[in-house]
UniProtKB/Swiss-Prot annotation:
Biased composition (Basic and acidic residues): 155-164
Species whose genome carries this gene: Eulemur macaco macaco (Black lemur)
InterPro entries the record matches: LIM1_Testin, LIM2_Testin, LIM3_Testin, PET_domain, PET_testin, Pk/Esn/Tes, Znf_LIM
Entry text on domains: The N-terminal and the C-terminal halves of the protein can associate with each other, thereby hindering interactions with ZYX.
PROSITE patterns, sorted: LIM_DOMAIN_1, LIM_DOMAIN_2, PET
Record protein name field: Testin
Primary gene name: TES
Length: 421
């Protein structure tokens, strides 16, 4: 790819969703404008997933690329135009006749994603067992939740070097090896079945990596256990509660078919969010979403949100940073060797802090420098000086003294308070 093509591709990436309104900030945001290397809006600092951007094709490409070169190729299709794998997500449309006085109208419900099972009744049961606000019905809160989790749990920059900011050839190679490794060892997609349907596999069957979804190997004797399974009590691997007869369960092949989950319990062990489209990563007997699995394997830059493949990076405030990305969150100036203040877990340089975030002294009405001592009571602050922290009536210095606060004013005595009331 030549330089002109690369620059054009980068420009198109930054034009995507340009001007889209923020669902969180509403009118406070002028519209989405992607930061050059942070994965946020330059105007409101919210993520792309917080904006009303139509990303269905992009998300389908991202998940399609995730499943490429895995056992889940049945879930993707390659476009003839560019050969890019697209995720064939299962969309479910339910039609319910609604009786009216004269006619019978049809109520149609479209799920933007549903488990890819042949039994639609089972898929419908699965959906009903999810919290209402997490059911991906088109145009609903649940559909917005799914869209947000696709962006959070499966960031494109965790699998595609071209989505990252200025990786070296060595870092690109390391990332490609890392992605190949997690595809082979951890990535999986849950299966929805009735617990009794798995009895045919036998209790001594095991998963073989690299096989197709139906591959299993018999170990030991294969005697008939049907009578034993008839009275088996199944319990959820997450909540330990029993499974009701006839309710669908989720199985994770990498975990083994001796484990099963309620639909609402198939969650990441770190963020506890539903695993979007039942895509999971299995490690140390735990389920992870893509983001938190990668976090357990590699440090993540708190500035650009990308995994760090360089040997040189910095640690500050219990977070990891690319050396070039330890910058002021407001002005992007590099902070190495500079004074900074953490604001909502983001580092801000001293000038930006004083300009944008510093509290104002109730005495002199100037911003309080972060390195200067101050007195704070409720939402009010003062410079801890003889010029500012004074009785609002007689101007007596109150440092180290008892005082009476009244709506931003402070008094040294009841008498002074009465004189000002």
């Amino acid at each position: 790819m030549d330089l002109e093509t690369k620059v054009k591709k980068m420009g198109l990436g930054h034009e995507q969703g340009f001007g889209a309104p923020c669902l969180k900030c509403k009118e406070k945001c002028e519209g989405f404008e992607l930061h050059f290397w942070r994965k946020i809006c330059r105007n409101c600092k919210c993520g792309q997933e917080e904006h009303d951007i139509l990303l269905s094709n992009e998300e389908d490409r991202k998940v399609g690329k995730l499943f490429e070169d895995t056992k889940y190729t049945t879930l993707i299709a390659k476009l003839k135009s560019d050969g890019i794998p697209m995720y064939k997500r299962n969309v479910m449309i339910l039609t319910n006749p609604v009786a009216a006085r004269k006619n019978v109208s049809i109520n149609t419900v479209t799920y933007e994603w549903a488990p890819p099972v042949q039994n639609q009744a089972l898929a419908r049961q699965y959906m009903q067992m999810l919290p209402k606000d997490k059911q991906p019905v088109a145009g609903s809160e649940g559909a917005q939740y799914r869209k947000k989790q696709l962006a959070k749990q499966l960031p494109a920059h965790d699998q595609d070097p071209s989505k990252c900011h200025e990786l070296s050839p060595k870092e690109v190679k390391e990332m490609e090896q890392f992605v190949k490794k997690y595809k082979n060892e951890a990535l999986g997609v849950g299966d929805v079945k009735l617990p009794c349907e798995l009895d045919a596999r036998g209790p001594n069957q095991m998963y073989i990596p690299g096989g197709d979804r139906s591959t299993s190997a018999a170990v030991g004797a294969m005697e008939d256990k049907s009578a034993e399974h008839k009275n088996t009590q199944y319990s959820c691997y997450c909540c330990k509660m029993s499974m009701k007869e006839g309710d669908p369960a989720i199985y994770a092949e990498r975990a083994g078919y001796d484990k099963l989950w309620h639909p609402a319990c198939f969650v990441c062990s770190i963020c506890y969010e539903l695993l979007v489209d039942m895509i999971y990563f299995w490690k140390d007997e735990k389920l992870y979403c893509g983001r938190h699995y990668c976090d357990s394997e590699k440090p993540r830059c708190a500035g650009c949100d990308e995994l760090i493949f360089s040997n040189e990076y910095t640690q500050a405030e219990n977070q990891n940073w690319h050396l070039k990305h330890f910058c002021c969150f407001d002005c992007d100036n590099i902070l190495a060797g500079e004074i900074y203040v953490m604001v909502n877990d983001k580092p801000v340089c001293k000038p930006c802090y004083v300009k944008n975030h510093a509290v104002v002294c109730q005495g002199c009405h100037n911003a309080i420098d972060p390195e200067v001592q101050r007195v704070t009571y409720n939402n009010f602050s003062w410079h801890a000086s003889t010029e500012c922290f004074l009785c609002s009536c007689c101007s007596k210095c109150l440092i180290g003294q008892k005082f009476m606060p009244v709506e931003g004013m402070v008094f040294c005595s009841v008498e002074c308070k009465k004189m000002m009331s």
